[in-house]
């Protein structure tokens, strides 16, 4: 990831919206900048990652069926860039909207294992309901 120069508010996608395979999104976080760990960055970091199909992510050479409809995969088939330890909970922003939340993975930046994100659009109704309750 490289340093991120500004922070802004990003809206959520509509219920059930999805980004097509190959769409390039941006993940941001304060986590480790290398798979081996090491010192955490002193600035917010960001990386551009393409959306990976559920079929590829669920292949026997990757997550072998463990990816559900509530998840999004993103990363390069060559590896090299990814969210990593300490980035969990951070946003995956696509077209200016928070489509994913950093969830889990197998190592970091491994070409066989894209990063796994919670699919925000699958929970949009719940987010709206909770927001309405909080405003009462």
Regions found by a protein language model. Name each.
Residues 1-136:
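Extracellular "complement/coagulation-type" protease architecture
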């Amino acid at each position: 990831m490289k340093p991120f120069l500004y922070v802004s508010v990003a809206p959520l996608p509509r219920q059930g919206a999805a980004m097509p395979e190959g769409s390039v999104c941006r993940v941001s976080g304060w986590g480790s900048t290398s798979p081996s760990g090491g010192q955490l960055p002193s600035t917010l970091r960001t990386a551009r990652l393409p959306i990976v199909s559920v079929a590829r992510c669920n292949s026997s050479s990757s997550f072998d069926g463990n990816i559900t409809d509530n998840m999004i995969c993103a990363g390069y088939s060559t590896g090299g860039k990814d969210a990593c330890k300490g980035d969990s909970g951070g946003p995956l922003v696509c077209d200016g909207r928070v489509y994913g939340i950093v969830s889990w993975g197998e190592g970091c930046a491994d070409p066989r294992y894209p990063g796994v994100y919670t699919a925000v659009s699958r929970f949009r109704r719940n987010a709206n309901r909770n927001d309405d309750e909080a405003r009462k």
